[in-house]
Design a protein with these regions (language model features):
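Exported/periplasmic ABC-transporter solute-binding proteins
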Residues: 1-7, 12-160
Length: 160
């Protein structure tokens, strides 16, 4: 979005919703992990690779909280982390709240303290050369207001 604003393609961007990292454990939580404090004792903890967005955010949280964690595996995408946890191959992993929501009963969710400081932002803006800027603005208004319950149902945090 920053590039679109810089080159004049979009104006007045706004955050519509955010997506926060959560910890997931397999259904039934066989390793009995209750918090991120339990992770140093797990030999099967997975994260995304630091070079992809989910891994970058995870690294920021780890650095911010000064956590002493050592993932047994670093995956290229959130779906791989989620798959390892849901299948029981991993004791725990960090994924976006939307992915945890989509997994349903296959996983259990544990909040990561401080994760809300490091989110993915879902942005919206009217393009500078929109053919129908008023209608485009109306869509953004719906997405930032009336759509809040739908954002929540899907695991996002809507902006208030």
């Amino acid at each position: 979005m920053d590039k679109a604003v810089q080159d004049g393609t979009a104006t007045a961007p706004e955050v519509l919703a955010t997506n926060v990292m959560v910890m997931v454990v397999p259904k039934g939580n066989p390793a009995e992990i209750q918090s991120v404090g339990d992770l140093p004792h797990s030999d099967h903890f997975v994260l995304c690779d630091p070079h992809v967005p989910c891994g970058d955010i995870s690294s920021q949280i780890i650095d911010d909280k000064r956590l002493d964690v050592h993932p047994s595996s670093q995956e290229r995408q959130v779906a791989d982390v989620l798959g390892k946890v849901a299948s029981g191959e991993a004791d725990a992993g960090w994924v976006y709240s939307t992915d945890a929501t989509a997994a349903g009963d296959d996983v259990e969710v544990i909040d990561i303290p401080g994760a809300e400081k490091f989110t993915n932002q879902i942005m919206g803006a009217v393009t500078a050369e929109a053919s129908h800027p008023d209608q485009a603005r109306a869509v953004l208004d719906i997405l930032s207001g009336d759509f809040a319950s739908t954002w929540r149902e899907r695991g996002f945090t809507p902006t208030e």
